[in-house]
Design a protein with these regions (language model features):
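Histidine-centered active-site/metal-ligand motif
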Residues: 125, 476, 747, 878, ...
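Cysteine-centered motifs
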Residues: 823, 934-937
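Charged, low-complexity alpha-helical linker segments
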Residues: 909-927
């Protein structure tokens, strides 16, 4: 603490002092609230809403509203908010982060600002890290809100669309960060407004805010579908990776060293940089790969896939560790959250890494995925009008919260003084010595009935310690990713006298560890950390499990110089010091210099990780700006705006683009390339092809005007084919949405490829982020043009079927399809794809675009007890209207280009291809169907 802080207090202390008059005001209202009956207290909600309508603000209502919630908590739950909890509630309402120690009642604190902000009627989201906590908090804390007349909802992983919508429409909604983000993405993929589940993002309170906004910031939310790519290459690369020999580099290759042409002496077939988690082939390794795959040059563009996959295989074998980064369960690879130790079902590593690990562990390799929609938590939570956060540890990341999220961190004083004793780190030479010391410490504490919580970083370590304790006859519980189902129960019992619990990382976070009287008298909960984490914040979270609400407790970290943190980031001088001191085996060292070295190593990693997250945000900000534009335009279409004028503008723009591209007034019309112009425009807008006669003696603008008139006339003729104009309006909306989605998905992939390669710009002394922005801008404009052209192409070539068939569709009966049964079934396979996301197959097809709530299996869509098939391209079905839309003048046939003569075989091939390109949507009451088989099949 510097001199300024000693005199004036820390910034948090000054903020708390500034808030105290407001707290005094809330407490002064306590006698008035106690006099009110339950009905009168409930009536305050109606009174507050009326006062808001009359012009008062939430800040005006705050003292009285908080006093009402405080009294309701006492009557409903028997829990009255402490003064420090009132302070925390005010901080959250102000859109800041309240750092509150473990056991200070953060869950109860959230009821204060959530009630106040829910009075506006726009919805409040209370965000937690898992379904268990969301459900628990909704059931317990929701009673306060319901008592006061507010509605409370909870969104869980297995809920259906209607249940989610009902929950989001409540005044206060408890939900996990993952469900919240995925629902946002799915809402921006729906075809009809009625399929939306979320309201606008108004105000959220994020519990464990550091876990969500810091730890998970590097992991984007992705909804994906299978890409159809073969998995054979992963198997081949895995075989080769096991044959390659790991070597060493004389020193790390920096960018400057590469630019200056410094030579790095390497041994073996590949080298591993564990700090940056990078694997590079040596020259010797490159030759072996080329020989294995019988290729001449691995660096050739055509061999990029092999190069990428062999790198993935080497990463899987050398940087991804079983029972640390992932577990194998039921012939499946399940990712372990590095910060919580929990399994993350349904999540998969992207870019082929998951498939490489599947090949390594000899489980079934699932096909690679294609990204359909993605967003990072950084950008998602910045969409809220206001957000607040709670955690036990945030001050160490205060700069990041302020720079990226514009949120201040305020330390809230504890209700009772913390009397936990935090011992100096115990440092040993080897891991073996360290683990022996840990077991001895557990045995010693257990002998006096003191409960012990042992925190490990990996599952492997937790199982090793479990075996060692068994040999000592110590009864204990193990809590890691393999046994996470019993998490809450095991953690809640960890404070009982004589209890010994081994937990991976912060498993059990959010569940209080309460001491019994015997345990309290034995010294309280003993925390033993078996390794320092990369982040000081995670270490502080582990320590914070002990000493809640003034309880006794103690903590100590046991470290060896063989730990990853010390090996990769600690100074080599420490090993020399140990050696020079002649430290005996099993001898423990405690020294200020050692503690400082460990802290400096952690600071170095924290700074490095912050840089990575900041860099990710710089790139994702570009994606986010484009995403905002696309989603905004998409929502306008979804909201039912009349698209006729927009379509006409697309027609005008498309004609302008190609006229300007192909014709010039500076060149005589006889020299214009009419074939090129007809080849690019007429497939989009079927105007009459231009000929030398039709353009003779005309200026460019004259031709432009004639083409626009003809294009508009053609579209008006198309509109006249529809019994009702609204049918075409509906079609315009559906087609445009489908084109936007299709092109946006491709654009996401292109942007990722661009980002992966843009780092090379640094070698040319150019800023990669600036280069990325410029390239992304050009790509975005190309995508917009492509959306317009595809939309027009589809709209100009749709055709309304005969009424009898339309009526059958409308009644949901089987429809005769003019197509080949065999071709149709061939198209089915591998086309309808469920989008895999966190824990679930997403309620949206990869290509078919079925609405949320459908279940996708083997190309068949089942919904509301009905059954149907979707085709290779987005289906077009005017909902509630008796119409079937197909492409081409006849189903399965496309118009011939004027003036072309084609053979019968060529015509047949084109007709067959057209059948496969046609959109079809068939809905029937069962599996019965009627198809015709083409001559070819």
């Amino acid at each position: 603490m510097n001199m300024f802080s000693k005199v004036f207090g820390t910034r948090s202390q000054r903020e708390v002092k500034r808030i105290m008059p407001l707290v005094e005001k809330i407490e002064s209202l306590r006698p008035d609230m106690q006099k009110l009956s339950d009905e009168e207290l409930r009536g305050k909600t109606r009174e507050f809403k009326k006062r808001l309508e009359e012009g008062e603000t939430l800040d005006d209502l705050l003292p009285e509203a908080f006093a009402v919630v405080r009294e309701a908590g006492k009557r409903v739950l028997g829990m009255e908010h402490f003064r420090v909890q009132l302070i925390g509630g005010i901080i959250l309402h102000q859109g800041r982060i309240a750092e509150m120690r473990t056991g200070e009642g953060k869950t109860l604190v959230a009821t204060l600002p959530s009630y106040l902000n829910a009075l506006e009627g726009k919805g409040v989201h209370v965000v937690t890290v898992n379904d268990y906590l969301a459900k628990r908090d909704a059931e317990e804390m929701g009673k306060i809100h319901e008592f006061l007349g507010l509605t409370v909802g909870v969104v869980l992983n297995d809920m259906k669309q209607d249940e989610r919508r009902a929950a989001y429409n409540c005044d206060v909604t408890y939900v996990t960060n993952n469900e919240l983000g995925f629902d946002y993405l799915r809402d921006n993929m729906v075809i009809y407004k009625e399929q939306l589940v979320q309201r606008d993002l108004h105000y959220c309170i994020i519990d464990e805010v550091d876990s969500i906004l810091i730890d998970e910031a590097r992991t984007p939310l992705i909804i994906s579908g299978q890409s159809g790519k073969s998995t054979k290459l992963y198997e081949a690369c895995d075989i080769l990776a096991q044959q390659l020999e790991r070597g060493e580099a004389s020193h790390e290759m920096t960018k400057m060293a590469a630019i200056m042409g410094e030579e790095v002496i390497e041994t073996g077939d590949f080298v591993v940089n564990e700090k940056d988690k990078i694997v590079n082939l040596t020259e010797q390794g490159v030759h072996k790969v080329e020989k294995f795959f019988h290729i001449e040059n691995l660096a050739d563009p055509e061999n990029l896939e092999i190069q990428h996959n062999i790198t993935l295989a080497l990463r899987a074998h050398n940087l991804m560790h079983k029972d640390q980064d992932y577990v194998v369960k039921d012939d499946e690879i399940l990712i372990v959250d590095e910060f919580t130790g929990r399994i993350m079902p349904g999540r998969r590593y992207s870019d082929g890494l998951h498939q490489a690990i599947e090949a390594k562990e000899h489980v079934k390799i699932k096909r690679e995925s294609k990204t359909l929609a993605t967003i990072t938590f950084q950008n998602f939570f910045n969409k809220y009008d206001k957000k607040g956060g709670m955690t036990g540890t945030a001050v160490t990341e205060e700069k990041e919260f302020r720079d990226i999220y514009a949120m201040d961190v305020v330390e809230i004083p504890t209700n009772r003084p913390v009397i936990r004793v935090d011992h100096e780190d115990a440092v040993y030479m080897t891991k073996k010595e360290k683990f022996n010391a840990v077991v001895n410490a557990v045995v010693e504490a257990h002998a006096k009935q003191q409960p012990v919580l042992v925190g490990t970083i990996t599952i492997e370590t937790s199982e090793l310690l479990s075996r060692m304790l068994k040999r000592q006859g110590i009864k204990h519980n193990v809590l890691n990713a393999k046994f996470h189902e019993l998490e809450a129960e095991i953690v809640s019992q960890a404070g009982q006298a004589g209890a010994v619990t081994i937990a991976t990382n912060m498993a059990g976070r959010g569940t209080d560890i309460k001491l019994d009287d015997v345990a309290r008298n034995a010294g309280g909960l003993m925390i033993i950390g078996t390794e320092r984490h990369e982040s000081r914040r995670i270490d502080n979270q582990l320590r914070g499990r002990s000493g809640r609400q003034g309880d006794p407790g103690e903590s100590r970290f046991y470290i060896s110089l063989e730990d990853d943190l010390m090996r990769l980031f600690g100074s080599e001088r420490l090993m020399k010091i140990f050696t020079s001191l002649g430290v005996a085996e099993n001898e423990q060292i405690e020294h200020k210099m050692l503690s400082n070295a460990i802290e400096k190593a952690q600071e170095k990693i924290e700074f490095n990780n912050f840089g990575i997250r900041k860099n990710l945000l710089d790139y994702d900000q570009v994606n986010n700006e484009q995403r905002e534009i696309i989603y905004k335009e998409r929502r306008q279409v979804l909201d039912g705006e009349n698209m006729r004028e927009a379509i006409y503008k697309m027609i005008q723009d498309t004609v302008d683009t190609y006229v300007d591209m192909c014709f010039s007034d500076d060149v005589d019309s006889e020299e214009w390339d009419l074939n090129e112009f007809n080849g690019v425009l007429t497939p989009i807008i079927p105007v009459r092809p231009l000929t030398a006669e039709s353009v003779k003696g005309k200026k460019r603008d004259e031709i432009r005007h004639e083409l626009k008139e003809e294009a508009v006339k053609l579209y008006e003729e198309k509109e006249a084919e529809f019994p009702e104009p609204e049918q075409l309006r509906e079609l315009e909306r559906v087609v445009l949405l489908k084109c936007i989605d299709s092109k946006w998905m491709d654009h996401i992939d292109d942007m990722e490829i661009l980002r992966q390669g843009i780092g090379l710009a640094a070698y040319g002394q150019r800023d990669p982020v600036v280069e990325y922005k410029m390239s992304a801008f050009d790509m975005f404009n190309e995508m917009i043009t492509s959306i317009q052209e595809d939309t027009l192409r589809m709209l100009y070539h749709v055709h309304v079927e005969q009424k009898i068939e339309r009526d059958l569709i409308f009644r949901g009966e089987a429809v005769a399809m003019k197509g080949c049964e065999r071709c149709f079934h061939t198209l089915q396979q591998g086309i309808i794809r469920g989008a895999v996301r966190d824990g679930n197959r997403a309620e949206r097809g990869g290509a078919g675009g079925n609405s949320a709530g459908s279940r996708i299996s083997e190309g068949i869509v089942e919904r509301d007890g009905r059954r149907g098939y979707l085709g290779v391209e987005p289906f077009l079905h005017i909902r509630g209207k008796p119409a079937v839309l197909t492409r081409g003048k006849e189903r399965g046939k496309i118009p011939e280009q004027q003036g072309e003569k084609k053979s019968a075989a060529q015509k047949q091939r084109e007709q067959d291809a057209a059948v496969q390109r046609s959109w079809f949507h068939r809905i029937g009451s069962g599996a019965d169907s009627y198809h015709k088989v083409c001559k070819k099949c």
